[in-house]
């Protein structure tokens, strides 16, 4: 790991807000590289990711890779694709899924990490937390509308998505345009960025 990236990694571990995780031997879970051309900003690692120490190592990750049109090898190559969740630790289980990422976490750590990745050309925002934070939206703004209007954000280097969780299968069935119209554009964007010299 590059010394600048390592310094941030160690600072995250040393931060008092993460002391409970550090005491339990749990490191922050994200993947970055100076050469990354795409950054995927998701919610927070799930229980499987925390256990295996591999981000997006579940059914949601399989679906996301399919949406992006990339292999597992490409997805986990930090010099091509950076994986930067809104919280680098599993926040625990809630009533209807995982708890949300902690407030203020992304604001504290993302800027320094993104500054070390000057080649990023596309930021894929996965789920409501990432979409609202990076597109500066209100909680009242409809995620479905934002995702449908993806072309309004491509020029700014962002591509908003719903979360690929199996729990969103009903949303997928109610919004067939997503698979038919949006995903082909996403795949083309990802491919174009990765193929750029």
Regions inferred by a protein language model and the residue ranges of each:
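A polyanion-binding, active-site-adjacent surface
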Residues: 1-148, 152-195
């Amino acid at each position: 790991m590059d010394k600048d990236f390592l310094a941030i990694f160690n600072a995250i571990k040393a931060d008092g807000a993460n002391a409970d995780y550090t005491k339990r031997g749990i490191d922050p879970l994200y993947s970055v590289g100076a050469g990354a051309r795409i950054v995927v900003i998701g919610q927070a690692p799930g229980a499987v990711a925390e256990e295996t120490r591999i981000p997006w190592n579940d059914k949601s990750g399989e679906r996301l890779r399919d949406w992006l049109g990339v292999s597992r090898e490409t997805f986990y190559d930090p010099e091509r694709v950076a994986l930067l969740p809104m919280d680098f630790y599993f926040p625990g289980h809630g009533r209807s899924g995982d708890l949300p990422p902690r407030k203020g976490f992304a604001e504290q750590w993302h800027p320094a990490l993104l500054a070390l990745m000057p080649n990023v050309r596309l930021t894929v925002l996965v789920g409501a937390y990432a979409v609202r934070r990076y597109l500066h939206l209100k909680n009242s703004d409809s995620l479905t509308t934002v995702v449908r209007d993806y072309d309004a954000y491509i020029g700014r280097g962002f591509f908003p998505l719903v979360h690929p969780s199996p729990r969103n299968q009903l949303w997928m069935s109610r919004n067939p345009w997503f698979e038919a119209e949006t995903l082909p554009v996403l795949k083309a964007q990802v491919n174009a960025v990765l193929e750029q010299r």
